[in-house]
Amino acid sequence: MTQPKLAFLALGVLLALGLFCSIPVALAEDDDSSPSRVSKTTDPDLQQARRLIRSYNYEKALTYLKRVLQRDPDNADVHNLLGYSYRKLDRVDEAFTHYNEALRIKPGHLGANEYIGELYLKLGKPEKAEEHLKVLDDECLFGCDEYDDLKQAIKDYRRHNG
């Protein structure tokens, strides 16, 4: 193969690889799984709830999240943030309700799978956490923070609990 053809082929491979690697990033952007991640929405109640969560004021964040939920009851991200806030307040039943609703709406929701897994660990159910780790493994083709965080939490749990 001549040098110009080889260079052209290498360029094509690099472009294809770059496109292939950008697909998971584009897909992940739709899933607002972290309470600290900036939302694409301009909803002032959701923005205020996120600020409150970042400052650990979970109780007050609930007020704003419930307002958003009234307007958008099928928003998996809002259910995830409600579950997160309730979990941080040790209100386990309410946390499960909202995590499960987020997962009903969007079974592959990264944050809800991570956080419900962490909640299962808190309740001494590592096998249930492993189920959600498997979902994250399937969803995160090239790895993601949610998978890494839950995997580490399971590892820590097993180290401390045999």
Briefly describe each language-model feature range.
Residues 71, 105, 138-142:
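Structural marker of alpha-solenoid helical repeat scaffolds
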Residues 118-145:
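TPR/TPR-like (Sel1-like) alpha-helical repeat modules
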Residues 40-71:
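Alpha-helical segment of the N-proximal tetratricopeptide repeat
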Residues 81, 115, 149-153:
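Canonical tetratricopeptide repeat
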Residues 41, 75, 109, 143-144:
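Residue-level recognition of tetratricopeptide repeat
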